[in-house]
Swiss-Prot record:
This is Protein eva-1. The gene is eva-1. GO terms for cellular component: cell junction; M band; plasma membrane; striated muscle dense body. It comes from Caenorhabditis elegans. Acts as a receptor for slt-1. Required for the guidance of the AVM pioneer axon to the ventral nerve cord. Acts as a unc-40 coreceptor to enhance the sensitivity of unc-40 to the madd-4 midline guidance cue to guide muscle arm extensions (muscle arms) and AVM mechanosensory axons towards the dorsoventral midline. It is a single-pass membrane protein.
Length: 461
């Protein structure tokens, strides 16, 4: 496997992207993840009533769904498959422009035209919204393979529930008196849409009991069979089977307008629901067999563990006692040598690849690239300016210290000259320093015997 070292330039731009985005991105970009398809979502989509809409070029359509539901586009077609004289004739301006066309060409263009991205485009505009307005023209669909042909839009959509309620029904224990049956019911004009049903342990129902092991058992098929798309349903607490010994029913459902359900859903004739229930029954049988087998194996294991093994007199017993060891023993086992890793040297291919990535980043993210460059230049300018200021301060401090030392030395020199001239070299250094420290002194300098006039000097520092 060829590896290379990422260049510092690419690392700088990655850092800039992280700073400008304000969040750390994952190292794997655009990775595909496998998501299991939830069968209940397919059942819910098949349960929806299909609302069909048709409009010609230049018209406007509005899609809307009841409260607590959202639009789910099922089909979408924009183009033409029938002649213009049968559906959505061309407008006056377009009809006049087509007057000079070949009749055979007009028949061809007026009969076949299909904008393949129509379904995707309508889904982008209207999915997961409660209300949506679409203008039927070629500008809405961003591509028109047949501009001389008058087209129309045909689509279908359903209203799927967007939020569900959760409720836990505490089932009685075997020692408790029997309680009334569980009843799920919607008000008039609404029906049940069940999303999930489980039997599981719940601290809400057993506040005084410590739950050591959480247990969850799926009972969605049993609840769907009795409650889906119904105005109400009754569930018997002892009729719902699960593997949890002390489980309670936890249902995720919602009551929505009756108008969103299809006739097949109301009658309980959904193909996807029947297939799901059959598969669930088969899996339930396998789970039951596996569960009871595990229980039997566990019982046999407990029986074997509880029973004491027979003692064989011929088998020597070794006591777990180390008192007979008279000295410490050390043993060094041979270990495998550590794996040798080859040193990865930078190569031109890796650097070139990094530079290409930087160029590609510039093309796709111009604003972020400019912001990264501005940020890098600003940081560099701040660092240089700080270095200049620190250098200037250090040099000024050195100059001031030098000037102070020079002034002190100059003053000491002048003082020594004055004192030496006064004493004429006859005074000792001890007397000189004493007079300088006193700062005020009076000295008489006695000359030679020939000198008639006495000379004295007085200095007051």
């Amino acid at each position: 496997m060829n590896m290379h070292i990422v260049s510092p330039v690419l690392l700088l731009f990655w850092f800039g992207i992280i700073v400008t985005d304000g969040k750390l991105k994952s190292g794997f970009i655009g990775g595909s993840h496998h998501h299991e398809v939830n069968p209940i979502e397919g059942i819910l989509r098949e349960s929806l009533r299909s609302n069909r809409v048709q409009a010609c070029d230049g018209e406007r359509i509005t899609l809307s769904c009841p409260r607590n539901t959202q639009i789910s586009v099922q089909t979408g077609f924009y183009g033409r498959v029938v002649p213009e004289n049968q559906l959505c004739p061309p407008q006056a301006g377009r009809k006049h422009s087509e007057a000079n066309l070949d009749p055979l060409s007009m028949i061809h263009h007026s009969s076949t035209c299909d904008v393949i991205q129509a379904h995707t485009r309508i889904s982008e505009l209207c999915d997961k919204r409660r209300k949506c307005t679409v203008v039927v023209d070629s500008n809405t669909f961003e591509d028109d393979p047949c501009p001389t042909t008058s087209k129309y839009l045909q689509m279908a959509y359903g209203c799927i529930p967007m939020s569900f309620d959760e409720e836990t029904f505490c089932t009685p224990k075997p020692t408790d008196p029997p309680r009334p049956e569980i009843r799920l019911e919607c008000r008039e004009g609404r029906r049940l849409a069940v999303y999930s049903a489980q039997m599981k342990t719940s601290p809400q129902c057993d506040p005084e009991t410590e739950i050591r092991h959480e247990c969850v058992s799926d009972v969605l098929p049993q609840v769907l069979r009795q409650c889906h798309a119904k105005e109400g349903c009754t569930l018997k607490s002892d009729g719902i089977k699960g593997h949890c010994r002390h489980g309670h029913l936890h249902v995720v459902y919602v009551c929505v307008n009756e108008e969103i359900f299809s006739e097949e859903a109301i009658k309980g004739e959904l193909t996807s629901l029947e297939t799901y229930l059959k598969e669930a029954d088969a899996m339930q049988k396998q789970d039951d067999e596996r569960f009871f087998k595990d229980v039997n194996d566990k019982t046999q294991w407990e029986r074997v563990v509880d029973s004491e093994p027979a003692k064989d007199p011929d088998v020597h017993q070794i006591a777990n006692d180390a008192s007979y060891v008279t000295h410490d023993e050390y043993r060094m086992e041979k270990q495998d040598p550590p794996p040798i890793t080859e040193r990865v040297e930078p190569n031109l291919v890796g650097v070139g690849h990094d530079l290409l990535q930087v160029v590609q980043f510039f093309k796709e993210n111009k604003e972020k690239a400019v912001m990264c460059i501005v940020l890098a230049v600003s940081m560099a300018a701040i660092v240089v300016l700080s270095a200049c200021i620190i250098t200037r301060l250090c040099s000024s401090n050195k100059d001031s210290s030098r000037s102070s030392r020079r002034s002190r030395s100059r003053r000491s020199l002048e003082t020594s000259k004055l004192v030496s001239s006064n004493y004429g070299g006859s005074i000792t250094p001890q007397h000189m320093m004493q007079d300088i420290e006193d700062e005020q002194f009076l000295r008489f300098s006695m000359g030679s015997a020939a000198t008639s006039n006495p000379h004295y000097s007085h200095y007051d520092f």
